[in-house]
Amino acid sequence: MHEGDEVTTKEIKSYGNKMRLQEARDSANRLLGFRMRSVFEMKRRLKEKDFDQEEIDHTIQNLINKNLLNDEEFGRAFVKEKVRNKKIGPRALKKEIYQHNLADELTESLIQEVYDEFNPKALIESHLTKKRIKKKTIITEKDKKRLTDFLIRKGFYWDSIRDVYYDWELI
């Protein structure tokens, strides 16, 4: 295009579409600059920015082709980060990952994989240590209930909690 050229309405529309696609790609890349995202989350965020479905689909496919958007890699990084930093149990992790709308089989395999690496009993023990509970310490029923409720809120199953209590001779 040069100065003085006449531009048709069709060409203007074509340039407008190309600009919108570029804006969608730029927006997606900015979002990925902060942290990894799931496909579902990226679609939602682009929709919030008023991009139409065609622009969103094109941008998502472009990111997937460039391997910048990958649910499995996102899920693996997400579950590791949550368990490593928050030391949460399987139930809480499942609740947190549910928001990202990953496939059920993928979610289950990621949870299994992360708890093969981070033993739930070791995580419970780290919470007990942080709460300054020592092995073979006698604690009141009230304190035991508070501790149990805390661990259940952290997403651990009663069976794991009970096993640690027996190992530490708290029961």
Positions of predicted regions on the chain:
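An alpha-helical, amphipathic repeat domain used for nucleic-acid recognition
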Residues: M1-I171
